[in-house]
Amino acid sequence: MVEQTTSEPAAGSMPKISFGVKKREENKVQAPAKAVVIEVDLDSDEEREKNEMERAAKRRKVMHFEDGTVQGDIDKPKEAAVIPMVVEHDWRTQKLIEKEKAGTLTEEERAKLALVLPNGIDGENEEESGKGEKIVVEDGRGDTEDADYSAIPIESFGLAILRGCNWKDGDGIGKNPQKVALKLPNRRPPGLGLGATPKNPVGKNKNTGESSKAEEEKLEEIKVGSFIKVVDGRNKGVYGKVEGRDDDSNSLFIRTAIGGKTMKVSQIVAVAVSAKEYERDSKCLNKSEYDKEKDRLETERKKLESQPPSTSTSQSSKDYKSKSSSSKHDKNSSEYERNDKMWARTDLLVRFIDEDFKRGSLYEQKVRIVDVAGDNDVTIEDDRGNTHYNIRQSWLETVIPREIGEKLMIVAGKRSGQLAVMLDKDKRKEKVTARLVATNDVVTAYFEDVCSVKIRHEEDYE
């Protein structure tokens, strides 16, 4: 605080000014002392009522204030509704009831009335009469135009009628009452069309004999950060990591393991995989072909192991066994050589059997071989005239002509590459009888050694 004082100037002198500084007094606010809480057992009725009112006030719905107090509705506990069963009395019972109300009922008539109405006139002797909120049903049969249907919820109406027939919640109904568990249908994932069945291969392990060590990671619900594999659609076989979810459209945003691209896939075609499987298979480009080849080699190995060795003691049986085993070995080796040998030729009509090529668009279709440059470089033409390149021979199989007289080509043996006309077909023995076009010789061959042809230029075979 600054104070300014001035003195009257004397004649012929300058005025004097002086300043004084005073320290402001600070008023410190003292914190109140901590209140000491003493726990006292409240056993009086007044204290209990006060506590109950406080608890009710906490649950009270605030509507408005009046005179500084809260005015609102207290939610009363709802009781189960009961609709008493309407009983129609005949004229004899009605006469006894009227006498009972008038007070002129004799002891004999009172006994009759007790036999007719074991629960009393108004059901006052019924055990369940005091439980639940009763809805009185009038005996009159007047119009129900002014019926108040809001008196009871529609979902509670049927249960209220059953309670009026002495039914208790949880009891079974019928001659042999038993409790039946409520079966709730599974919620269909959004985006799944009507009639479609969702695929759920999650958690199904093909190798059921694996140890618990291999099952260290349990597959849970797909969430952000989970590893998934696409099992259907154009991105079939793609592995990725979930970066986001769109529950409204039941879709996932994933980042692919190969290429690191971000794509949106439906959750219906995605299954969760373990981190071990993701590290092992996510970088494999041709996983499906690798699995097929692995299964084929495993089948051949088991087939060879199942053949018992010859253990006969006699020399003749040894010779016979050795000859038969050698013939089997020669047959198997010849079949392997024939299957491994190039049999595909131009103008052959073959069937496409690979399911993964172009999402199965050519699967089980008949195609024509246009050019053959190698067992992994075959050019084909489909029924629409589209040409496909770099087709493997293992993706094709031979086709047998349907009608007698159609042309075919021998694709195995010493007559490989020769045209013939089919004369007969034996489906039981899987053989065809054909006449060679060049020499008119009649030959017999197995189904797998011949194939139908679709020749564009006849002069190439003259």
Swiss-Prot record:
GO terms for biological process: mRNA splicing, via spliceosome. Residues 154-202 form the G-patch domain. Its main location: nucleus. Pfam families: G-patch_2, GPKOW_C. One of its GO terms (molecular function) is nucleic acid binding. InterPro entries: G_patch_dom, GPKOW_KOW2, KOW, Spp2-like, Spp2/MOS2_G-patch. Transmembrane segments: none annotated. Residues 1-26, 182-218, 289-337 are annotated as: Disordered. GO terms for cellular component: spliceosomal complex. Residues 306-317 have a biased composition (Low complexity). Residues 221-248, 401-428 form the KOW domain. Keywords: Nucleus, Repeat. It is found in: Nucleus. Belongs to the MOS2 family. This is G-patch domain and KOW motifs-containing protein homolog 1. It comes from Caenorhabditis elegans. The lineage of its organism: Eukaryota, Metazoa, Ecdysozoa, Nematoda, Chromadorea. The gene is gkow-1.
